[in-house]
């Protein structure tokens, strides 16, 4: 495929993504060898296309390519952790989580990743609460505050 044809396909994919037609975007994406693409942001977009179509393995493979192109991308590690969890690969998610923590030890999102991993492992309510409390103590985020309140209710605690 020459550069002109590639650029046309990429533009088509972007149009489909903007229309939220991820199925068509994926059909176009399937015709491209993403290993030859160097643009990490484009690879990230393609990963999202596969994720929206619940093709988590493909999403992960493309996102790994993006991470190779931009190894300082903690955003990619965060997303790789999420994708591994969606795929049910807890061990792999923990590996990405560890890399994320090493790369960005001050990033409070590590507590969210920890919570998501614990949740996937079916950890105790107290462990889940502790992970979310650490995040909420650092960041005030309504979504996660609500989740924490639900955990308190399930655990029969009135801390909320």
PLM feature spans:
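Alpha-helical segment of the N-proximal tetratricopeptide repeat
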Residues: 5-35, 45, 51-52
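Start-of-helix register in tetratricopeptide repeats
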Residues: 7, 41, 75, 109-110, ...
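Residue at a conserved register position within TPR or TPR-like alpha-solenoid repeats
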Residues: 16, 50, 84, 118-119, ...
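Residue-level detector of the short coil/turn that links helix A to helix B
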Residues: 20, 54, 88, 122-123, ...
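Single-residue signature of alpha-solenoid repeat helices
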Residues: 25, 59, 93, 127-128, ...
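Conserved structural position within tetratricopeptide repeats
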Residues: 31-34, 64-68, 99-102, 133-137
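Short coil turns that delineate tetratricopeptide repeat
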Residues: 37, 71, 105-106, 139-140
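Canonical tetratricopeptide repeat
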Residues: 45, 79, 113-114, 147
């Amino acid at each position: 495929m020459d550069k002109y044809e590639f650029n046309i396909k990429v533009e088509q994919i972007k149009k489909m993504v903007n229309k939220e037609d991820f199925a068509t975007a994926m059909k176009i994406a399937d015709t491209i060898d993403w290993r030859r693409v160097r643009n990490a942001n484009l690879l990230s977009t393609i990963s999202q296309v596969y994720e929206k179509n619940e093709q988590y393995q493909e999403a992960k493979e493309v996102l790994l390519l993006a991470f190779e192109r931009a190894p300082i991308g903690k955003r990619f590690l965060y997303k790789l952790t999420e994708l591994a969890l969606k795929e049910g690969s807890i061990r792999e998610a923990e590996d990405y989580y560890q890399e994320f923590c090493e790369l960005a030890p001050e990033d409070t999102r590590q507590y969210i990743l920890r919570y998501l991993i614990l949740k996937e492992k079916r950890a105790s309510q107290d462990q889940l609460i502790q992970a979310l409390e650490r995040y909420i103590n650092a960041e005030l985020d309504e979504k996660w505050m609500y989740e924490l309140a639900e955990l308190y209710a399930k655990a029969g605690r009135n801390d909320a």
